[in-house]
Amino acid sequence: MYKFLVFSSVLVLFFAQASCQRFIQPTFRPPPTQRPITRTVRQAGQEPLWLYQGDNVPRAPSTADHPILPSKIDDVQLDPNRRYVRSVTNPENNEASIEHSHHTVDIGLDQPIESHRNTRDLRFLYPRGKLPVPTLPPFNPKPIYIDMGNRYRRHASEDQEELRQYNEHFLIPRDIFQE
């Protein structure tokens, strides 16, 4: 019976590893949520609170200054019987001219390239985005450990000493060239 229990436990471990099952342990707890900050309303009275007091910059009238004026002032004076789609000054940008144009650019190829308005969205071709990368041992690379102790030098003299030792051992002495 003891051999059967040992064999079955080893078999369960191999099966869990082979079937790519990872047992998720609840080790992460999200931080506690903070209560919303409540602020009191400033007592403004009947006066609007401007950011800069005392400057002589003319400001647009507001409804607080003039309660008779409407909340939305129409400075452009557009004709209410005419529909303006994109721009008042450029009649080529209205919706009627956009519907009748083809939106293709011919650059001399076999087929013209469509502009960005008629192009297809690539999210429909690849709805999931990138394929998932396997993370189990036959697929993921083993980590390479690099000694980071000598990466940053504290003093420039250490670099000069190392360069001097390198020149002594691996380079040709300058005395040979002077002869």
Curated annotation (Swiss-Prot):
Keyword Signal: yes
Positions of the propeptide removed during maturation: 17-120, 153-179
Post-translational modification: O-glycosylation is important for the antibacterial activity of lebocin.
GO biological process: defense response to bacterium; innate immune response
Entry's localization field: Secreted
Cellular component terms (Gene Ontology): extracellular region
Organs and tissues of expression: Hemolymph. Produced in fat body.
Induction: By bacterial infection.
Keywords: Antibiotic, Antimicrobial, Glycoprotein, Immunity, Innate immunity, Secreted, Signal
Glycan attachment positions: 135
Chain segments annotated as transmembrane: none
Superkingdom as given in the UniProt entry: Eukaryota
Chief place of localization: secreted
Signal peptide start and end residues: 1-16
Function (record text): Antibacterial peptide.
Family the UniProt entry places it in: Belongs to the lebocin family.
Protein name: Lebocin-3
Species per Swiss-Prot/TrEMBL record: Bombyx mori (Silk moth)
Upper taxonomic lineage: Eukaryota, Metazoa, Ecdysozoa, Arthropoda, Hexapoda
Gene coding for it: LEB3
